[in-house]
Curated annotation (Swiss-Prot):
Highest taxon of source: Eukaryota
Oligomeric form and interacting partners: Homodimer; disulfide-linked.
Family: Belongs to the formicidae venom precursor-01 superfamily. Ant pilosulin family.
The protein's role, per its UniProt record: Causes a significant and dose-dependent histamine release, probably by influencing the signal transduction of mast cells through a non-IgE-mediated pathway. This peptide does not have cytotoxic activities.
Localization in the cell: Secreted
Listed name of the protein: M-myrmeciitoxin-Mb3a
Cellular component terms (Gene Ontology): extracellular region
Primary location group: secreted
Length: 91
């Protein structure tokens, strides 16, 4: 009698293990996917910041070229005022 109870208990444990194993697999797979998604977001944000910094550098270069052109034309006072305004904007 005890042997049949033991085998019945083992059968129930085996069935429960089989039934619940897909849930455990899903939980095990969810963590790496979430980490990969988080890393992808981090890289995407890093790329966006790098592009924004490149755009700022390009704007500064364009402004410098404009100021050089203004100075060449002989508008030194205007160039000095523009430099002050631009410095205040970048601070």
């Amino acid at each position: 009698m005890k042997l049949s109870c033991l085998s019945l208990a083992l059968a129930i444990i085996l069935i429960l293990a089989i039934v619940h194993s897909p849930n455990m697999e899903v939980k095990a797979l969810a963590d790496p996917e979430a980490d990969a998604f988080g890393e992808a977001n981090a890289f995407g944000e890093a790329d966006a910041f790098a592009e924004a910094n490149a755009d700022v550098k390009g704007m500064k270069k364009a402004i410098k070229e404009i100021l050089d052109c203004v100075i060449e034309k002989g508008y030194d006072k205007l160039a000095a005022k523009l430099k002050k305004v631009i410095q205040q904007l970048w601070e």
